[in-house]
Amino acid sequence: NVHLGSFYHLAFAKKVGETFEESEHHALDRVLMFQGMEGYDDIRPGLTKVAEWDREPQRGSERASGDGGEPRADSENEATFDDFEIETADYGMNFESEDLHVDDIAADSASITEAVVAGERDDQFADAIALNAALRIYAREDVTSIDAGLTAAREAIDDGSAAAVLDDLRAF
């Protein structure tokens, strides 16, 4: 019951949340959208703006290191909308877009991801994959902060459970 996506203007991200709030056909409780480089729906090197919509107000998430203001809602019973920024350097990830360049996005990204979840790579790609996994873990509310999501993502890579999930998806 979580939607992940991307947005170009913050007003659009808010409109997406409002649309799900009014929808009679989609029972989503949470929307996380990213404004990264070139509209990617993931965290890219540098600064990424994140928009967060929750159907249930005041969930009490801490986000990135408990980093900020209160979610905005018009009344106690209405959904909340908030936005915040993620800077990859704040997570000890000092790399540029060029460091993540690949020639064939689909093929290279797949093989790199396989190597990372198999524990065969520990480089900028591994950091980028772990941070993006952290946001997805946070979006599902398995953790209350992005920092905790990053710890969980790295543990899943280290203990092999990330590779097991990838294997299960392949078998599906």
Give residue spans per PLM region.
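Glycine-rich anion-binding loops and their surrounding alpha/beta cores
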Residues: 1-145, 152-172
